[in-house]
């Protein structure tokens, strides 16, 4: 079977910015994918092609990427006669058609839209669920599927929210839950208590949510945010049963070799900027005082020494996740492994640009006993393919925002459906989230 039609258009993401949607048609029907977009992006990410015309969409249009699908990728892919079930062959074809290391010719957003739509078509051609098709092409174990711990971003700061809080994400992780559905229920209950506490302490407007559905009160310090979350966990009746994870996104406030925790203030006091060692001391204090099990991007992607110095101090206690550091790219994952900088990969398909490359990035991380956390982007859509990716790749952990905003819930609801479909053929990763490959 082959692809008979490929068509792209622009639609809007959860921020109201244009993004690329791709339809791939085969004899089995039409298969659609929508590409997400990030706000805090790594400098080494694959090239997202934007129009740059400031008179429209503030320069964020994607008509060039859409045209690249319709005028270049579509005719070449249809003419190739490639089978939609062969994901690696099609992704390789797309990479050759682009011909650049970072996909700047056609745009990673154009290429990824086609790659993901093809994956859906491939699953339909095999008459299997998408997660099973992904498990097949990644050669993941299928005796029992692993359902992930939902890392839920319940309090937003950094570039995802107003207020002066520097750290970008404060997540809850119900690792002690007996199942995914129970983990989601626990997370939802904690979230509602957090909203109530936030409003009562900071005023009604503090219950307004950030880009990823978490509350975004005007909090200044991470301790204040963590105290609020711990109080919410206790109020919900889950003291000692729900863990906490951070995405610091520290590259966002890395300036002149130091870290400015007051980076949203244009007149921040330079004498208060922290060195890598001072920031590490802050993390160690937080780890000692709160139930933190994972920290993402604790240092800038340019500050490799800080990562390598921090790793031996805390790696036995928690997961250290590379996002901006590794950008789902084997080159940077290998470097992080060699430098002993991290022990987990944040997997974002749009950082690298094809499903096949994403799978290979995960496999490289697994080969060094790293954990892998599948992730959404802050500019999301109703597409829920990452739910199938996290189950198919058996990574055991996903972050896709708070239990709020339908573009976030789309992914979590899809995992609920998969859980129900699999029944006893699936296990919840729980406390084994970091080593889910071994479950």
Curated annotation (Swiss-Prot):
GO terms for molecular function: magnesium ion binding; phosphopyruvate hydratase activity. The keyword Cytoplasm applies. Substrate binds at residues 160, 169, 296, 323, 375-378, 399. InterPro entries: Enolase, Enolase-like_C_sf, Enolase-like_N, Enolase_C, Enolase_CS, Enolase_N. Keywords: Cytoplasm, Glycolysis, Lyase, Magnesium, Metal-binding. Disulfide bonds: none annotated. It is found in: Cytoplasm. Mg(2+) is required for catalysis and for stabilizing the dimer. Pfam families: Enolase_C (PF00113), Enolase_N (PF03952). It catalyses: (2R)-2-phosphoglycerate = phosphoenolpyruvate + H2O. It comes from the Eukaryota. Mg(2+) binds at residues 247, 296, 323. Its cofactor is Mg(2+). Its main location: cytoplasm. Its EC number is 4.2.1.11. GO terms for cellular component: phosphopyruvate hydratase complex. Pathway: Carbohydrate degradation; glycolysis; pyruvate from D-glyceraldehyde 3-phosphate: step 4/5. One of its GO terms (biological process) is glycolytic process. HAMAP family: Enolase (MF_00318). NCBIfam families: eno. Belongs to the enolase family. Homodimer. This is Enolase 1. It comes from Debaryomyces hansenii (strain ATCC 36239 / CBS 767 / BCRC 21394 / JCM 1990 / NBRC 0083 / IGC 2968) (Yeast).
């Amino acid at each position: 079977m082959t692809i008979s039609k490929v068509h792209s258009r622009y639609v809007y993401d959860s921020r109201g910015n244009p993004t690329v949607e791709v339809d791939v048609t085969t004899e089995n029907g039409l298969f659609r994918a929508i590409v997400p977009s990030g706000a805090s992006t790594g400098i080494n990410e694959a090239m997202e092609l934007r129009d740059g015309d400031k008179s429209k969409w503030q320069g964020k249009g994607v008509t060039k990427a859409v045209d690249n699908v319709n005028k270049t990728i579509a005719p070449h892919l249809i003419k190739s006669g490639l089978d939609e079930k062969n994901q690696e062959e099609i992704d390789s074809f797309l990479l050759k058609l682009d011909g650049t290391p970072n996909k700047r010719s056609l745009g990673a957003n154009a290429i990824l839209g086609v790659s993901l739509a093809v994956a859906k078509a491939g699953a339909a051609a095999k008459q299997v669920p998408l997660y099973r098709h992904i498990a097949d092409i990644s050669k993941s174990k299928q005796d029992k599927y692993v359902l992930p711990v939902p890392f839920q971003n319940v309090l937003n700061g950094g570039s995802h929210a107003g207020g002066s809080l520097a750290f970008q994400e404060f997540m809850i992780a119900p690792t002690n839950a007996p199942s995914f559905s129970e983990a989601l229920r626990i997370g939802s209950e904690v979230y509602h208590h957090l909203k109530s506490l936030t409003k009562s302490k900071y005023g009604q407007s503090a219950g307004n949510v950030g880009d990823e559905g978490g509350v975004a009160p005007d909090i200044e310090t991470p301790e204040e945010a963590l105290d609020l979350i711990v109080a919410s966990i206790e109020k919900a009746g889950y003291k000692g049963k729900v863990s906490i994870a951070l995405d610091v996104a520290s590259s966002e406030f890395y300036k002149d070799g130091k870290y400015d925790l007051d980076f949203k203030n244009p007149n921040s006091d330079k004498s208060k900027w922290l060195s890598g060692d001072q920031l590490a001391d802050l993390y160690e204090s937080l780890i000692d005082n709160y139930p933190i099990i994972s920290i993402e991007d604790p240092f800038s992607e340019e500050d490799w020494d800080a990562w390598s110095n921090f790793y031996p101090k805390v790696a036995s206690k928690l997961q250290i996740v590379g996002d901006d550091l590794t950008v789902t790219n084997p080159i940077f994952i290998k470097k992080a492994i060699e430098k002993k900088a991290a022990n987990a990969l944040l997997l974002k398909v749009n950082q690298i640009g094809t499903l096949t490359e994403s799978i290979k990035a995960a496999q490289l991380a697994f080969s060094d006993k790293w954990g892998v956390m599948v992730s959404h982007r802050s500019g999301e859509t109703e597409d829920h393919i990452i739910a199938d990716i996290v189950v198919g790749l058996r990574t055991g952990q996903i972050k896709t925002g708070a239990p709020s905003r339908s573009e976030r819930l789309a992914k979590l609801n899809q995992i609920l459906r998969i859980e129900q479909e699999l029944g006893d053929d699936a296990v919840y990763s729980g406390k084994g989230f970091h080593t889910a490959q071994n479950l």
